[in-house]
């Protein structure tokens, strides 16, 4: 009979051990779920930040590109018949003359 009680005692101890293990597994699962949720949130935030950075970098590149149009004041002076180049600045252009230096300055 004593052996039967020993078996019941061992089953009781095993049940307690299994309950403790199950509680530990449940705790680990909760921590893992929280970590996975946080990871997903951080990944989405990182992607949004990368998109914003890419937009910002595109804007910076656009700011750094030279203007397609020359300075309107220089165009006006040149159209009035004056040199705008460094060599002959403010000298009158001869009739029908075009100065390559002036044109280069305008369309640089």
From Swiss-Prot:
Binds 1 zinc ion per subunit. InterPro entries: YabA. Transmembrane segments: none annotated. One of its GO terms (cellular component) is nucleoid. Its cofactor is Zn(2+). GO terms for biological process: DNA replication. It is found in: Cytoplasm, Nucleoid. The keyword Cytoplasm applies. Keywords: Cytoplasm, DNA replication, DNA replication inhibitor, Metal-binding, Zinc. Zn(2+) binds at residues 83, 85, 99, 102. It comes from the Bacteria. Belongs to the YabA family. NCBIfam families: PRK13169.1-3. Involved in control of chromosome replication initiation. Inhibits the cooperative binding of DnaA to the oriC region, thus negatively regulating initiation of chromosome replication. Inhibits the ability of DnaA-ATP to form a helix on DNA; does not disassemble preformed DnaA-DNA helices. Decreases the residence time of DnaA on the chromosome at its binding sites (oriC, replication forks and promoter-binding sites). Tethers DnaA to the replication machinery via the DNA polymerase beta sliding clamp subunit (dnaN). Homotetramer. Interacts with both DnaA and DnaN, acting as a bridge between these two proteins. This is Replication initiation control protein YabA. The lineage of its organism: Bacteria, Bacillati, Bacillota, Bacilli, Lactobacillales.
């Amino acid at each position: 009979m004593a052996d039967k009680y020993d078996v019941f005692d061992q089953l009781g101890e095993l049940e307690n051990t299994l309950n403790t293990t199950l509680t530990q597994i449940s705790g680990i699962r909760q921590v893992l779920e929280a970590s996975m949720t946080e990871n997903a949130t951080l990944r989405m935030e990182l992607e949004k930040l990368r998109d914003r950075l890419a937009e910002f970098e595109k804007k910076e590149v656009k700011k750094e590109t030279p203007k397609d149009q020359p300075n309107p004041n220089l165009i006006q002076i040149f159209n009035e018949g004056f040199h705008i180049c460094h060599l002959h600045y403010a000298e009158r252009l001869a009739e029908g003359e075009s100065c390559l230096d002036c044109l280069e300055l305008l369309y640089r």
